[in-house]
Amino acid sequence: MKKYFSFDKNISVQGRGFYIAAAGGAAYQNLSHIRAALQDQGFNVSLEDRSQDMGMLSLQGPYSREILSKLTQTPLDNESFPFNTNQMITVAGHRVRALRVSFVGELGWELHIPRASCVPVYQALHQVRYSQFIP
């Protein structure tokens, strides 16, 4: 049986564990592959799929840092928040995981947001974008 494992994901160390974010189209296959590998290797670990509990917003482009900085106290400069890292931050009063990534060759973040906070975070980002960056 051929196993499928997509490399379109972000994996980061979280204390003694890992945070894995996979692209939506390949998430199920990735989860199945990881579960099978854990079982095959006999690792004594737990794996929790939080896909249904989370949403994701992608904020990309040259103004992404300025827009996000209007809604968080977290420093977003290159030294404080290097490329390809992630941090738990507060955005518009909501705790989110911010991943500094780029899909367009420019500055950008992915925000992984608890389901209940998705709409308020989106609305806050949208308001900042239109009130300050769109003439």
Where do the language-model regions lie?
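Basic, glycine/lysine-rich polyanion-binding surfaces/domains
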Residues: M1-P135
